Amino acid sequence: MALLTTVLSLSGCTKKPDMDESVLIQLKKAGSDLSKPHNIEFFLYFPTQAVAEQAASKIRDEGFHVEVEKAAKGDTWLCSATKTMVPQLTSLQKIRRDFGALADSLNGEYDGWGTPVVK
């Protein structure tokens, strides 16, 4: 938690943490060692299987393991992208921007990421 507090105070930040910061804070509170690699899964939703497969191809080119399947609810398709990496705020924010732009370009939605706690 000290590292996250330092990052927030060094940036002069008094604003509410963004989505990625919030998840990192929750992981740290749960006892996760943020200096170790985590198996992080990112979630994108698309209106059709063809579009989800198109996104998956682009994401695979960036070194992610990707699976496409019908979403559990609704008529959308889930594109889940997994990568083992140290969860660093700047890297996660860049992925969010990149995946958000990709999803927007294909009429989809980027829905965040998750990872198990790593001790």
Feature map (PLM): residue ranges:
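Long, contiguous binding/interaction regions
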Residues: 13-119
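Sec-dependent bacterial lipoprotein signal peptides
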Residues: 1-11
